[in-house]
């Protein structure tokens, strides 16, 4: 393949990754605080989104509180050209060791989700298998201060929308939004509606 065609193909693949990332972020912008080119623990991510919710129950007046809870979701996004098993293992390790520092398991903490969405032009079969079998669950003070789960989604743009999105067990919520937006990209530029 001539150099000009290879450069054009690479640019199109990059555009598809960025287009999918933009669509996913647009689907989450109503509820999440989104930052582009986010620097965290010495690494720059193309995007980072966080969601916080607070709930409480009280009797008659707000001072007579029965309970209160906080839940959080921290979503890291990464765009890569090629994803192999070693690179995915590094990303998972980063989430378990460094991204978990985002979690503040205070007295009213109920749960936090650490989410990692990796958009790749191509992912190896081994990487997809590792993504599917990845498990991480951490409880704080025997569960009295809540828990954290790792939600992982790997998007292989070389596959169809139905087969190209692989998630772990905790990441099942991510699959529908990502698959729907990937299907819209595959339909072509005439479709501009963001799928939530």
Regions found by a protein language model. Name each.
Residues 82-97, 101, 125-129:
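Active-site-adjacent loop/helix micro-motif of nuclease/hydrolase catalytic cores
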